[in-house]
């Protein structure tokens, strides 16, 4: 039996500003358009031979609308809920054939629907620090800068990297270890307008992002209590670092 642990690394940029209207530090967060559980299911990142509890947990972590979508057994609709019109034909056919083999051929989806019906509650769409997977031979910092621009539209000249700050965290889910690495940046004054509406400006920037906004520490705590991923362990130290940075800067 294969018991090897799989490592998935994501690298991000915690970008902060000082809101001059309320004198509070804020950071940019993005909200995913779909849950991690839904993405893992569509991309077949699970074992059909795993115990049913593991699969039910996956469905528990989907939103209600996502579970309803899976119950249609229409893989095209599931796939384009994530990819929209992105041309990924080879990957699509590979994942569709696996979905068909796992769920459609044995009993025309009856087991899948039965498992979904056992799910309770519902997952939420995560608010996250902008991050993503590094490309081959790409440095950690280069990846963080690239992913931040892709998800927010804000280019490199508008912020300053604070190189003394670099934090990482890891967590495990089954046989997968997820490692997140974060750098820290301070926004330049030219983009510090408190009423700058990032949601309207960049919401269509990338297919996987549905919303983007500035959040202070109180909001970060509120968001963290309502979702499975806690943002405080990374953003809290980043805000403290920014406070000290601004104190010594002035």
Curated annotation (Swiss-Prot):
InterPro entries in the cross-refs: NUDIX_hydrolase-like_dom_sf, NUDIX_hydrolase_CS, NUDIX_hydrolase_dom, Nudix_hydrolase_domain
pH profile: Optimum pH is 9.5.
Domain (Nudix hydrolase) ranges: 97-239
Xref: SUPFAM superfamilies: Nudix
Active-site residue numbers: 147
Residues bound to Mg(2+): 138, 151, 173
Induction record: Expressed early and up to late in the infection cycle.
Pfam families: NUDIX
Cysteines paired by S-S bonds: none
Compartments it resides in: Host rough endoplasmic reticulum
Calcium recorded as keyword: no
Keywords: Early protein, Eukaryotic host gene expression shutoff by virus, Host endoplasmic reticulum, Host gene expression shutoff by virus, Host-virus interaction, Hydrolase, Late protein, Magnesium, Manganese, Metal-binding, Multifunctional enzyme, RNA-binding
Quaternary data: Interacts with host RPL23A.
This protein's name: mRNA-decapping protein g5R
């Amino acid at each position: 039996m294969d018991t090897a642990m799989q490592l998935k690394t994501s690298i991000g940029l915690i970008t902060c500003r000082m809101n001059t209207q309320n004198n509070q530090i804020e950071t940019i967060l993005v909200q995913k358009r779909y849950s991690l559980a839904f993405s893992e299911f569509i991309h077949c990142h699970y074992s059909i031979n795993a115990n049913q509890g593991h699969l039910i947990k996956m469905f528990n972590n989907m939103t209600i609308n996502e579970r309803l979508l899976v119950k249609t057994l229409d893989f095209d609709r599931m796939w384009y809920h994530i990819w929209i019109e992105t041309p990924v034909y080879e990957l699509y056919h590979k994942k569709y054939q696996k979905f068909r083999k796992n769920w459609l051929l044995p009993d025309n989806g009856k087991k899948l629907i039965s498992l979904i019906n056992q799910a309770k509650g519902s997952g939420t769409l995560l608010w996250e620090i902008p991050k993503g997977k590094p490309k081959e031979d790409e440095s950690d910092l280069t990846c963080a800068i690239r992913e931040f621009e892709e998800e927010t539209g804000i280019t490199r000249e508008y912020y300053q990297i604070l190189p003394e700050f670099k934090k990482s965290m890891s967590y495990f889910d089954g046989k997968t270890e997820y490692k997140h690495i974060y750098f820290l940046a301070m926004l330049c004054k030219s983009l510090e307008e408190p009423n700058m509406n990032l949601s309207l400006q960049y919401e269509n920037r990338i297919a996987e992002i549905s919303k983007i906004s500035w959040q202070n520490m109180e909001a970060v705590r509120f968001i963290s209590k309502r979702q499975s991923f806690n943002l405080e362990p990374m953003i809290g130290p980043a805000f403290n670092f920014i406070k000290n940075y601004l104190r010594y800067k002035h």
